[in-house]
Regions:
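Context-gated lysine
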Residues: 8, 33, 45-48, 75, ...
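Binuclear metal-dependent phosphoesterase catalytic core
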Residues: 3, 88, 92-96, 104-138
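Hydrophobic/aromatic beta-strand patches that form the interior of the parallel beta-sheet core
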Residues: 10, 66, 98-100, 118
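Metallo-beta-lactamase
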Residues: 1-5, 63-65
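Short, surface-exposed loop/helix-turn segments at secondary-structure junctions
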Residues: 80-88
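Active-site metal-binding loops of divalent metal-dependent hydrolases
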Residues: 13-15, 70-71, 102-105, 121-124
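Active-site-proximal loop/helix segment associated with metal-binding centers of metalloenzymes
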Residues: 10-76, 80-81
């Protein structure tokens, strides 16, 4: 957690947790496995990343202004493939007013349960994404 210009901010990967055989088979074809510079071919490492992320999140206070994660904390409404757990990591409550995430490359901006969710995808160099500037005020 850090404070910047009066904003309390936290960030993590919030890594997902493949659980079923279908999830693991789907995961094996994902770009995360092929392009992110981590050894994610080992199931134990993937599960540990998820456990570490959940422990981090559970230890956060409930009054953050901004959380930034790679993986979204809920299913992205714009992602038709989003039912697979490789696209989100469920959390029980949202501990910030604003949550910015990426991972699934589907841009959106909506509010749910008092938290504004913003997907600001950048993507791989094979796609022409534009950088979106966002101004957040208290």
């Amino acid at each position: 957690i850090c404070t910047y210009n009066g904003f309390k901010i936290a960030g993590d990967t919030l890594w997902y947790r493949p659980s079923s055989l279908v999830d693991w088979l789907y995961y094996s074809g994902q770009n995360d496995k092929n392009f992110i510079l981590l050894d994610l071919s080992n199931r134990g490492k993937i599960l540990k990343m998820n456990e570490d992320s959940i422990a981090w999140y559970n230890g956060l206070p409930n009054d953050l202004d901004l959380i930034v994660t790679h993986v979204p904390p809920i299913k992205n409404r714009e992602n038709g493939k989003g039912n697979n757990c490789s696209y989100y990591t469920n959390v029980d409550t949202f501990k910030s007013k604003i949550w910015i995430y990426g991972h699934d490359h589907k841009e959106n901006d909506y509010e749910q349960d008092g938290t504004r969710f913003i997907s600001n995808p950048w993507g791989y160099n094979t796609r022409n994404y534009k950088i979106k500037t966002l101004t957040i005020k208290k």
